[in-house]
């Protein structure tokens, strides 16, 4: 039974999963839109939205908290100074997932994940 199981394991160890989500987050911040598998996109959505909510405050502590999660100065600065202010009047729902195709090699469902505004 999977009662009250709060996240997808994505077939990885906990540290590998954390690194994967961090790298996908940096990629979406830098590019604005990425294509990945549907389960990864669904798991990434919550991770990114929590970071944006934290970055919306825009103060020094928010900047530090975002950097602690990402460990990437360029992505942190872009998130806090460019992306988060766009969502100042929006309470959640900062990203959208669009199903795109079935990947030919392994029949995995693929999806785009992008920022809404």
UniProtKB/Swiss-Prot annotation:
Species classification: Bacteria, Pseudomonadati, Campylobacterota, Epsilonproteobacteria, Campylobacterales
Which HAMAP family does the UniProt record give?
Ribosomal_bL17 (MF_01368)
One Pfam family matching this protein = Ribosomal_L17
Q: Which domain of life is it from?
A: Bacteria
> Assembly and interactions?
Part of the 50S ribosomal subunit. Contacts protein L32.
Full protein name:
Large ribosomal subunit protein bL17
Q: Which GO terms describe its cellular component?
A: cytosolic large ribosomal subunit
The cross-references to InterPro entries, in alphabetical order and at most eight, read:
Ribosomal_bL17 (IPR000456), Ribosomal_bL17_CS (IPR047859), Ribosomal_bL17_sf (IPR036373)
Q: What organism is the protein native to? A: Campylobacter lari (strain RM2100 / D67 / ATCC BAA-1060)
Instruction: Report the GO molecular function annotations.
Output: structural constituent of ribosome
Q: Which family does it belong to?
A: Belongs to the bacterial ribosomal protein bL17 family.
Query: Could you state one GO biological process linked to this protein?
Result: translation
Which SUPFAM superfamilies does this chain map to?
Answer: Prokaryotic ribosomal protein L17 (SSF64263)
Q: What PROSITE patterns has UniProt attached to this entry?
A: RIBOSOMAL_L17
Disulfide-bonded cysteines: none
Q: Which keywords fit this entry according to its UniProt record? A: Ribonucleoprotein, Ribosomal protein
């Amino acid at each position: 039974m999977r009662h009250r199981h709060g996240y997808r394991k994505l077939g990885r160890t906990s540290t590998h999963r954390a690194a994967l989500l961090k790298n996908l987050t940096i990629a979406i911040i830098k590019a604005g839109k990425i294509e990945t598998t549907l389960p990864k996109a669904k798991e990434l959505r919550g991770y990114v939205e929590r970071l944006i909510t934290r970055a919306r405050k825009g103060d020094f502590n928010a900047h530090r908290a975002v950097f602690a999660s990402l460990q990437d100065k360029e992505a942190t600065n872009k998130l806090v100074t460019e992306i988060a202010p766009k969502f100042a009047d929006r309470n959640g729902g900062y990203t959208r997932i669009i199903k795109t195709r079935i990947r030919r090699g392994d029949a995995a469902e693929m999806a785009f994940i992008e920022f809404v505004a």
